[in-house]
């Protein structure tokens, strides 16, 4: 009997040791350098030929700010709440519809699961359509086509985590801002190059040491690309790194994990979502 008990204890101890080893081996793949590189404002881009819609959207933004609805939606995505899926109707010219252009690869602002859209912007879009008494139609497309589609009359409004930027005003009229954003770096978890950085100046000092032999990733058409390549409107000088654009920030981070690029620059909220998902 003593031998049996001893054997059981040995097996139990081995099991606990194995579990401990598995836990110790579960390391993160990537991390965010939690220092804001930019100071941006998000807004929606309205068809220039619809000034009445612009006024209505601005009134709507003021209302959801004052009644707490905007904060309520943001808390769902930034504080572990339960997101609400949004369904798009089929576009029909005979119906009174609000047609929204977006890029559903920008969690937590817009993303798609199955046939439903989720994200801060998508839940706002549903509220806006209800506020206007219209049926909601969502058109999902590449990010760099979003504002263009509105200017071509293919959509009424762009809702896609859009930073207010001068060259985009050629295509749309921006609403009042509804969210403050910034760019951040995503690097591999074992990357120590930025560990001593405390300020944006510290990060930029490190970035300035990189040459063309260093590859950086970003989502095409976003502020991250402008930050890396340089942009006169923003006052970005850019860096000497080789910039590689992707259709989604998650694709850039995955390519970094695969060893093809060195780091990624992307908006703070999507960066943190991507890192959380990549690390499981």
Task: Give residue ranges: language-model regions.
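A ligand-binding cleft/hinge motif common to bilobed small-molecule-binding domains
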Residues: 25-38, 145-148, 160-171, 227-234, ...
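Sec-dependent N-terminal signal peptides of Gram-positive bacterial secreted proteins and lipoproteins
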Residues: 4-25
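Extracytoplasmic small-molecule ligand-binding "clamshell" domains
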Residues: 42, 52-80, 92-162, 170, ...
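Periplasmic-binding protein-like
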Residues: 28-54, 104, 179-187, 268, ...
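Ligand-binding clefts/hinges and TM-proximal coupling segments of bilobed small-molecule sensing domains
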Residues: 32-38, 58-95, 201-243
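Acidic, polar ligand-binding/catalytic clefts
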Residues: 29-38, 126, 135-205
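Bilobed "Venus flytrap"/periplasmic-binding protein-like clamshell domains
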Residues: 104-107, 117-130, 180-250, 268-272
């Amino acid at each position: 009997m003593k031998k049996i008990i001893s054997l059981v204890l040995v097996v139990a101890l081995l099991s606990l040791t194995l579990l401990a080893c598995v836990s110790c081996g579960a390391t993160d793949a990537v991390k965010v350098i939690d220092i804001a590189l930019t100071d941006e404002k998000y807004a929606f881009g309205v068809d220039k030929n619809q000034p009445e819609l612009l006024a209505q959207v601005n009134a709507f933004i003021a209302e959801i700010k004052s009644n707490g609805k905007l904060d309520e939606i943001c808390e769902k995505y930034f504080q572990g709440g339960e997101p609400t899926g949004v369904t798009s109707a089929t576009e029909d010219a005979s119906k009174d519809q609000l047609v929204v252009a977006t890029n559903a690869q920008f969690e937590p602002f817009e993303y798609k699961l199955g046939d439903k859209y989720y994200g801060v912007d998508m839940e706002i879009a549903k509220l806006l359509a209800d506020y206007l008494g219209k049926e909601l139609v969502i058109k999902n497309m590449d990010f760099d086509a979003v504002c263009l589609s509105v200017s071509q009359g293919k959509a009424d409004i762009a809702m896609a985590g859009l930073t207010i930027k001068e060259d985009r005003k050629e295509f749309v009229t921006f609403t009042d801002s509804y969210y403050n954003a910034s760019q951040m770096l995503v690097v591999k978890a074992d990357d120590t190059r930025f560990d001593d950085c405390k300020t944006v100046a510290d990060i930029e000092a490190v970035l300035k040491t990189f040459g063309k032999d260093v590859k950086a990733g970003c989502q095409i058409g976003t502020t991250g690309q402008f930050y890396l390549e340089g942009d006169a409107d923003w006052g970005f000088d850019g860096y000497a790194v080789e910039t590689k654009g992707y259709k989604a920030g998650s694709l850039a981070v995955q390519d970094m994990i695969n060893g093809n690029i060195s780091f990624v620059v992307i908006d703070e909220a999507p960066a943190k979502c991507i890192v959380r998902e990549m690390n499981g």
